[in-house]
Regions:
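N-terminal capping segments
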Residues: 17-87, 136-137
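Catalytic cores and adjacent binding grooves of peptidoglycan-active enzymes
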Residues: 168
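Fungal secretory targeting signals
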Residues: 1-20
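...with weaker cross-activation on analogous glycine-rich loops/strands in unrelated enzymes
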Residues: 24-33, 86-165, 182
Length: 182
């Protein structure tokens, strides 16, 4: 009887704990937020074309060498991913916006979701046609701040700093999928 009571008590306690599935759902939701939170710390950092490493901002690269040290759009995203997850998208060949967006999910290691399902911390992409078969058609990436209209990004040399922008007023439509970091 004593063992039966102890077993019953353990069964009740175990049923009160969150399931593994619940824990994973919570964990998945926090990785993107943690990546966004890290990227937010770069507020005001200069834009540098080709700038960014796992260690932080770096000098701009040819053909645009203005002497700036900072991030470009994909450098900012890859730096934040590296800082939070330890994954180095720079050395995996996923640093460039189009290679990240066009990679299949197996190589990417993250899942793509329709734009309408965006969440904070998802990578959002821009590029006219968003055609993976056309060079240069995908040329900007940012991180969603919310599931609405706000993104965090390193827009370009004209703006010259990491900042918040509206996706609806960015100048071109967003690509049909976002990447969710989990």
């Amino acid at each position: 009887m004593k063992y039966l009571a102890a077993f019953s008590l353990l069964a009740c306690a175990a049923s009160a704990l969150p399931s593994l599935e619940t824990k994973l759902s919570v964990r998945k939701g926090t990785v993107g937020q943690a990546i966004l939170d890290k990227a937010l710390t770069a507020k005001g950092t200069p834009y540098a074309w080709g700038g960014g490493t796992c260690d932080g901002p770096s000098a701009d690269n040819p053909p645009y060498q203005y002497g700036d040290v900072g991030y470009d759009c994909s450098g900012l995203v890859c730096w934040a991913v590296c800082q939070v997850t330890g994954r180095d998208l720079f050395t995996e060949g996923l640093r460039v916006t189009s290679t990240m967006y066009c990679a299949d999910e197996a190589k990417l290691g993250y899942k793509k979701y329709p734009l309408e399902e965006r969440q904070p911390g998802d990578a959002i992409f821009f590029g006219g046609e968003c055609d993976c078969n056309t060079s240069g058609s995908i040329h900007h990436v940012g991180l969603m701040i919310d599931n609405g209209d706000r993104m965090w990004n390193a827009p370009n040399d004209d703006v010259n700093q990491v900042q918040e922008n509206s996706i609806s007023n960015f100048g071109e439509a967003a690509c049909p999928y976002v990447i969710r970091f989990t």
